[in-house]
Amino acid sequence: MIRMGFFLTLTVAVLLTSLICTEAVPTDKRGMERLFDHVLLKDQRQCPYCVVHCCPPSYCQASGCRPP
């Protein structure tokens, strides 16, 4: 009985993880281009916070960083 509960929990966790990861990836061409541009621009920002996080241009300008 305990094994069945363990495997049921494991199956649900894997299904939820795959659903979340599938939803996080854009499926249209423009979405993929934005994702690729974001990854390239992320390393070019001067602000240490913006290097780690995805900041909107208004945040970067307000904090004195180079906007994306």
Swiss-Prot record:
Residues 25-45 form a propeptide. Disulfide bonds join C47-C55, C50-C60, C54-C65. The keyword Hydrolase does not apply. Expressed by the venom duct. The keyword Lyase does not apply. It is found in: Secreted. Belongs to the conotoxin U superfamily. This is Conotoxin Vc7.4. It comes from Conus victoriae.
